Regions:
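Membrane-interface loop-to-helix entry segments
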Residues: 139-196, 247-251, 372-382, 409, ...
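Helix-loop-helix junctions that connect adjacent transmembrane segments
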Residues: 17-22, 59-60, 137, 166-299
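Alpha-helical transmembrane segments of multipass membrane proteins
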Residues: 47, 128, 147-154, 179, ...
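Helix-loop-helix connectors at the membrane interface of multi-pass transporters/channels
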Residues: 1-6, 92-95, 101, 121-142, ...
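Membrane-interface "cap" regions at the ends of multi-pass membrane proteins
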Residues: 1-49, 53-58, 64, 70-75, ...
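Hydrophobic transmembrane alpha-helices that form the core helical bundles
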Residues: 47-53, 62, 71-154, 159, ...
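A generic transmembrane alpha-helix motif of multi-pass inner-membrane proteins
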Residues: 180, 371, 375-376, 404-463
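TM-loop-TM module centered on a large, flexible mid-protein loop between adjacent transmembrane helices
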Residues: 92-93, 99, 131, 246-311, ...
Length: 463
């Protein structure tokens, strides 16, 4: 469960036109730590059971496929950050490389992600709470979490940075402890030789490309947010070198954590057909390797992470809608309103809360995850194409390493991302393409048949 930091937008500064220069103080190691915090070492937990099931027990292999797509895309983000060091975002890259119209649709796809982050966080928090207290129905948990998140965001209470740091330390401890206990369990029950086994990675009798790629498309959720490193380009001492390096290394480190987790988890619970509940399978594995104590520890971790993600996700989404309403991209009277006392976009928060509640009741967790990844992969594909258009075509950097960096790498990233993107389920693609079509219709109306340039929202850094 991921979320962008909605507290980053300071409305008073935006409205007063603050143009101060940010000091460049961040090193590549600062960027790496930031990226790992954003991705979270426990990001694999909510989707493990789903990936393991749809990939026919080959979740580790699905993560390796997802890594390939992410590595080439990470390199492309690094390339684009060298050109736009003061505004690192998919929206900025696409708008400036292609056209404001394509940039608008890229931003429209990202809006889908902002809507789904708090929604899928609420769904998973409710599923986890229902495992802890099954006497309370799932739908009641959904209502309670949605209401609580809405009240906190309306009142403007923000999560403290210290609390996030402590949470990161706890989640890292949890990830290391889980892997260590899984290794111990396999060693005790199956012997040392069982720790290195092909069944944790590849099952020839169940292998099929389609399920593997579907697993990769869902596993990509564990990488969502790595591109946020590029938003720190203006704060970085050497953005042209360090952004790309840090983004690629973060993807590699995240893969190591995820693959180690799913590999040993699959050795502990080899028969994925017997998961009591697919969405919370990681809790059952935790109970097997660490008893009730680890089960409760994992449950609390997932609950806190889910609520935290929902809080920051809704804050980011409501402020994005506020920025778009303020700039006239969407109705100003409805979305461009700030509460006079709390200073928060309350109308946008109410709307996002209602949509999140309805979505959590009507939508399965897997579909929410796939839709979130649908929007993300639209951005990933476009950023890879931006590198080709900007460096290979417009700048003509085609010789030697230029051919590799500006054509082969980004086109490989775009093709792998496209393949993974198209491997999403039919329902996810249907809803995703309908969303893009709605964006195209809105853009046509808003620009009077593409005669006018689309409005550009100053809140673009949120995307």
């Amino acid at each position: 469960m991921k979320a962008q930091d909605g507290g980053a937008l300071k409305e008073s500064e935006a409205q007063k036109g603050n143009t101060g220069v940010i000091r460049r103080v961040l090193t590549r190691w600062d960027l790496i730590l930031f990226g790992l915090v954003i991705l979270s070492p426990t990001a694999v937990y909510p989707v493990y059971g789903i990936v393991q099931t749809v990939a026919h027990g080959q979740a580790a292999l699905s993560y390796l496929v997802a890594m390939v797509a992410m590595l080439f895309t990470a390199a492309s983000y690094g390339r684009m950050a060298a050109i736009y060091p003061s505004a690192g975002s998919t929206y900025t890259y696409v708008q400036n490389t292609f056209s404001p119209y394509v940039g608008f649709l890229a931003g429209w796809a990202m809006i889908l992600d902002y809507f789904l982050i708090p929604l899928e966080s609420n769904i998973y928090a409710a599923l986890t709470a229902a495992r802890l207290v099954p006497q309370i129905p799932y739908i009641v948990w959904v209502f309670l979490f949605t209401l609580g998140v809405m009240i906190i965001n309306v009142r403007g209470i923000r999560l403290l940075a210290n609390a996030n740091t402590i949470m990161m330390a706890i989640m890292t401890t949890c990830a290391v402890l889980f892997i260590a206990l899984a290794i111990r369990y396999v060693h005790v029950h199956d012997g040392t030789s069982a720790l290195i086994s092909s069944r944790g990675l590849f099952r020839p009798h169940e292998f099929s490309v389609g399920p593997l790629m579907l697993g990769a498309s869902i596993a990509a959720l564990s990488y969502i947010g790595f591109d946020a490193i590029s938003t720190l380009a203006e704060d970085t001492v050497k953005p042209e070198k360090d952004i790309g390096f840090a983004t690629v290394l973060v993807c590699i480190l995240q893969t190591v954590i995820c693959v180690a987790t799913v590999y040993f988890a699959s050795l502990v619970w080899n028969n994925y057909h017997t998961f009591p509940q697919v969405e919370t399978a990681i809790l059952d594995i935790g109970h097997r390797i660490g008893g009730q104590i680890l089960f409760l520890f994992l449950t609390v971790i997932l609950l806190v992470a889910g609520v935290s993600s929902a809080l920051t996700g809704q804050a980011g989404f409501s402020r994005l809608l506020f920025a778009m309403g303020r700039d006239g991209v969407i109705p100003r009277s409805l979305f461009g309103y700030l509460h006079p006392r709390h200073g928060t976009p309350t109308r946008a928060i109410y709307i996002t809360s209602a949509a999140s509640l309805a979505g959590a009741v009507l939508m399965h967790f897997q579909i929410a995850v796939e839709l979130l990844n649908f929007g993300a992969f639209v951005g990933f594909i476009l950023v890879n194409l931006c590198v080709i258009q900007c460096f290979f075509i417009q700048r003509g950097e085609r010789r030697g390493m230029g051919l590799i960096r500006n054509l082969l790498f980004p086109i490989t990233g775009a093709l792998v991302c496209f393949y993974v993107w198209m491997s999403l389920s039919g329902n996810a693609k249907l809803v995703g393409f309908l969303w893009l079509a709605a964006g195209g219709v809105y853009l046509a109306i808003h620009t009077r048949g593409f005669k006018d340039r689309p409005s550009q929202w100053r809140g673009e850094e949120l995307i």
